[in-house]
């Protein structure tokens, strides 16, 4: 049984679960947001630059998606991406 898509957050998860990922765009309070499907995070030890790790949506997608959704990147920093997407209807986001 498919989950009913009621909010933009529901649509985000629907897009994220699709094997062919796209960037997700939405507008909110005068800002355009782009959540990149090809985002990467690199880490390494600061003292010796060893033990480099690469995290990308292909292998660590759920973990990175949750970090993105929990970030506060709007100008007033009063809402997380998750909170914003929860307020918007599904048709407010588009793929690119």
For each predicted feature, which ranges?
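Amphipathic, interaction-prone secondary-structure segments
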Residues: 18-49
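Extended hydrophobic/Leu-rich segments
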Residues: 8-12, 16, 35, 64-68, ...
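Negatively charged, low-complexity tracts enriched in Asp/Glu with abundant Ser/Thr
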Residues: 1-27
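Residue-identity detector for threonine
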Residues: 7, 43-46, 76, 80
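Mixed-charge, Lys/Arg-enriched low-complexity segments
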Residues: 56-96
């Amino acid at each position: 049984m498919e989950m009913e898509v009621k909010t933009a957050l529901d649509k985000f998860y629907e897009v994220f679960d699709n094997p062919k990922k796209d960037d997700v765009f939405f507008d909110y309070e005068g800002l355009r947001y782009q959540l990149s499907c090809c985002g990467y995070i690199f880490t390494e030890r600061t003292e010796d630059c060893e033990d480099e790790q690469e995290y990308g949506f292909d292998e660590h997608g759920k973990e990175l998606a949750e970090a993105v959704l929990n970030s506060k990147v709007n100008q007033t920093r009063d809402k997380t991406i998750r909170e914003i997407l929860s307020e918007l209807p599904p048709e407010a986001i588009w793929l690119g």
